[in-house]
């Protein structure tokens, strides 16, 4: 009798296609929401998850570092060489958001969008050239950093302009427009996918009904072609909608010259456009990299300013995890090189030296540095404004507030800064009772670490 019972069947592909990307988005949001004091150990999952992005690896390699997690992005690149854009279709949290958007309001891909395809490779090369020349904006556009920064803006009560633009493009043009045409990580995977081993091939006896072309979220399915393009997300929609037979995944090296040719080659126009993009990047790099504001007070462990700006992806995780919320994004008036990078206004809030910002930074812009070697800045006392120095009044609030005991007062009236102990946390400036400017101010230093 047991044999007469129907066997359990796995859920259909459409179930997993919706569940897994949605879980990727949910995990990212839930982990980021736990970036509070005290910081749970399991939040490091988000750091490791972010390391799937090969752009992050390129950022480390650019600075001459070979990270210990090298195998993670290499594994994703190998998976892409095997089957295509696995990460974009199944593991990307921003892709999960856009997939949900597509399930709510699906739109056919407009014909005019194809005119943008020749500019995708030049756009990617432009961004990679900016990264090579020391700009952190390329990483900002990658899915993990963009999503976490925009979510952080929501938590700060600000408008997530870029995320709204991504969603708006999905509503107006088609849901995966960002993934196909603008996302640097997606474009990099698309380039690698040109050499993928397995490719989806239309079934024998294709009647050219066009259903696969209409249902494909990236426009990778073409019934007139012998295979899907490098933008295939392996979602399986074409296979589900095909009225004739299932699409086959075939080895493009199986001897079929039509399949072997694939979409690997680059046209002459593509090469010329790419060269132009490199020239434009060379001209734009100085504008995007040149600081237009004075040396700001950075979080503890921040690298020297030029290297910090080249590494910081503006993801906002340090701001999210800061217990005193002293870390803020720099305003637009600071210029494109510094815009949205983290800085501290000590008068408004002090750094508690928890070093959580060092633990969550995915790019190494905020390095792991012991407190005793940290030098965010150096406190300086304006004797003409200090109550103890100018009026002989007993105050010493700066001495009481200092967590490093870097302020002494031999005469019990006039405070003095011990430069060898001061780390520039800003507790003294934050607690000073003198109206702005405070009588004691933390001045950023050229070097941010003690030898």
In which residue ranges do the predicted regions lie?
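Non-ligating segments of multi-cofactor redox enzymes
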Residues: 1-451
């Amino acid at each position: 009798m047991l044999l007469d019972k129907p066997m359990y069947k796995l859920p259909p592909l459409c179930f997993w296609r919706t569940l897994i990307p949605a879980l990727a988005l949910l995990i990212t949001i839930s982990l980021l929401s736990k970036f509070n004091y005290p910081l749970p150990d399991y939040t490091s999952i988000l750091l490791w998850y972010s390391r799937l992005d090969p752009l992050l690896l390129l950022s480390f390699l650019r600075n001459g570092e070979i990270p210990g997690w090298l195998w993670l992005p290499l594994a994703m690149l190998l998976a892409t060489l095997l089957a295509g854009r696995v990460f974009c279709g199944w593991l990307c949290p921003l892709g999960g958001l856009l997939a949900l958007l597509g399930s709510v309001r699906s739109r056919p891909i407009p014909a005019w969008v194809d005119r943008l395809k020749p500019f995708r490779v030049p756009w990617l090369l432009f961004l990679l050239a900016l990264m090579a020349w020391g700009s952190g904006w390329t990483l900002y556009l990658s899915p993990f950093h963009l999503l976490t920064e925009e979510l952080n803006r929501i938590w700060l009560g600000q408008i997530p302009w870029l995320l709204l633009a991504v969603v708006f493009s999905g509503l107006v043009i088609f849901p995966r427009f960002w993934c196909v045409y603008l996302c640097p990580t997606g474009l990099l995977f698309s380039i690698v996918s040109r050499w993928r081993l397995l490719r989806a091939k239309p079934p024998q006896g294709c009647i050219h009904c066009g259903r696969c072309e209409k249902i494909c979220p990236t426009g990778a399915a073409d019934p007139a072609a012998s295979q899907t393009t490098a933008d295939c997300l392996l979602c399986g929609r074409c296979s589900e909608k095909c009225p004739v037979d299932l699409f086959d995944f075939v080895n493009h090296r199986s001897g079929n010259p039509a399949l072997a040719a694939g979409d690997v080659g680059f046209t002459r126009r593509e090469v010329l456009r790419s060269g132009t993009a490199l020239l434009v990047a060379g001209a734009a790099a100085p504008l995007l990299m040149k600081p237009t504001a004075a040396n700001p007070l950075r979080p503890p462990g921040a690298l020297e300013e030029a290297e910090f700006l080249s590494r910081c992806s503006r993801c906002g995780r340090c701001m999210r995890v800061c217990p005193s919320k002293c870390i803020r994004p720099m305003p637009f008036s600071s210029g494109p090189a510094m815009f949205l990078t983290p800085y501290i206004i000590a008068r408004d809030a002090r750094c508690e030296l928890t070093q959580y910002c060092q633990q969550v930074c995915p790019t190494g812009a905020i390095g792991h540095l012991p407190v005793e070697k940290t030098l965010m800045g150096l406190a300086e006392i304006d004797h003409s404004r200090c109550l103890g120095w100018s009026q002989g009044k007993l105050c010493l609030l700066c001495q009481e507030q200092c967590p490093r005991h870097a302020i002494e007062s031999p005469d019990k009236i006039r405070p003095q800064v011990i430069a060898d102990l001061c780390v520039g946390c800003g507790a003294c400036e934050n607690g000073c009772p003198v109206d702005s400017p405070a009588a004691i101010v933390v001045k950023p230093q050229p070097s941010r670490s003690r030898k």
